[in-house]
UniProtKB/Swiss-Prot annotation:
Protein task: Part of the MsrPQ system that repairs oxidized periplasmic proteins containing methionine sulfoxide residues (Met-O), using respiratory chain electrons. Thus protects these proteins from oxidative-stress damage caused by reactive species of oxygen and chlorine generated by the host defense mechanisms. MsrPQ is essential for the maintenance of envelope integrity under bleach stress, rescuing a wide series of structurally unrelated periplasmic proteins from methionine oxidation, including the primary periplasmic chaperone SurA and the lipoprotein Pal.
Catalytic activity: L-methionyl-[protein] + a quinone + H2O = L-methionyl-(S)-S-oxide-[protein] + a quinol; L-methionyl-[protein] + a quinone + H2O = L-methionyl-(R)-S-oxide-[protein] + a quinol
Enzyme's top EC category: oxidoreductase
Stated name of the protein: Protein-methionine-sulfoxide reductase catalytic subunit MsrP
GO biological process terms held by the UniProt record: protein repair
Annotated Mo-molybdopterin binding sites: N88, Y91, E92, C146, T181, N233, R238, G249, I250, K251
Name of the gene encoding the protein in the UniProt record: msrP
Amino acid sequence: MKKNQFLKESDVTAESVFFMKRRQVLKALGISAAALSLPHAAHADLLSWFKGNDRPPAPAGKPLEFSKPAAWQNNLPLTPADKVSGYNNFYEFGLDKADPAANAGSLKTDPWTLKISGEVAKPLTLDHDDLTRRFPLEERIYRMRCVEAWSMVVPWIGFPLHKLLALAEPTSNAKYVAFETIYAPEQMPGQQDRFIGGGLKYPYVEGLRLDEAMHPLTLMTVGVYGKALPPQNGAPVRLIVPWKYGFKGIKSIVSIKLTRERPPTTWNLAAPDEYGFYANVNPHVDHPRWSQATERFIGSGGILDVQRQPTLLFNGYADQVASLYRGLDLRENF
């Protein structure tokens, strides 16, 4: 796999930024919702806590054994770990970016069962230990682009999805891959209460075309920064598809089903005019309510300090994945 020439050393986000509790800090500072209407400079000053030294420590995950293939390394400085695991979207635990870190400790990730079924010759069931032992793990430094026009760069640890699917032996009828998050309302407050969970229909579901799922970039992710994923980042296993918007990266997966027909996806069901099935990062196709031409890269400074940077087509992975969409109108199929 060719190194991604679009990544610069300044693009990768550092370990000290990953596990923040934003809501608690804002309350401690007495910052009200009205304060968030202040001009940009005031935002940067008020939210300078984002680069402070009094952040809670990152949760201690289990250390993982993994390789570091040169093609995925780039020797780049990393997005701080406390920001990557402290600034999250995981609506099952609340709508605020700090809610997942504050609330996801209730999720029991061991024991765990992941089933692979549908249009396969050999259905599989993996347990918690299989996720980290059955396949060789490798660290990959990937860009991550949220549909909300912010981005990070993260050293994920996992294995290519195509290796798992190959074991199940997809049949000739398989055209799509459907994913499903665990449904556990007793552990996930957003699944109990529509107000907490943003009014989405749960369990969260996602999908890919089979060729997208089989692409070498598509990663079943079990760790970050050398350790097992924390719950707020989708433990024990989540999907990373680096050329797509982050909401395609379904978390805490319990089911993978190969299908003949295109599967439903949560955000497309909720707002089909705003969130397409493909969700490829594209600076030329705006969200109906904001531009996608630029993005706010979250690094080691204050969250509103940083300069906006141009959004790259396919999040900088065009050389690797553009051929998947040859002849497809990316504006219509957003």
